[in-house]
Amino acid sequence: MASHATGDGSIPSRDANKKGLKRIMTVGGAYGTRNYTVKDLRDQKGKKTLTETVPFSIEEAAAAEEAGIDTMKVRFDPKNPELAIAIRNAAPNTFMAFSCPLIAAATKDEAVKLGYKAMEIGADAVMTQWSPEFIEAATKAGIPVQGHAGLVPRRSTWTGGLKAVGKNLDEAIWIYNQIKIFENAGAYAVEVEVIPEDLLIEITKRTSLL
């Protein structure tokens, strides 16, 4: 399988280390180079503020890599993966989490298959709105998973619509418990949307998740 970095399937040169890149092999079997691995990101927790963007085109992805953006989140449509593949190839050295559609997996086995499909085409991790059971199944299969807490748009009916959450004690405790459940399920990170900054500061002190 061709390398995302070299294009010819060969192991990247050791000189990659001099450029601050890590030599890797993807779950799909492609050699490549990345600015970060999951281990690197976890090692940075509490030490460095990283930048992330969501590119919607190959031009945006290439520009983000050139600008030194640390990580990218890429929308992944398993029925039409061509754009995700093109974005991966446009920014071959940047750590990418592919965002998997919630309704694309109805069982734990389907979640694992979907995660593998994303990893096969070059994802370094998957970002999901899955239940803890699905996350646990995927992580046990070796797939790095990022959960989703706080305001989860596709589940917003449970939190009163598209609005901030965590502004009272009950909601704050609920968010914290949700994040700890994801942590126990094996996730390495969690996206937390539209919650008070002070709450997030306190929660991050109490979890290993990024």
Regions found by a protein language model. Give the residues of each.
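Alpha/beta enzyme core
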Residues: 2-209
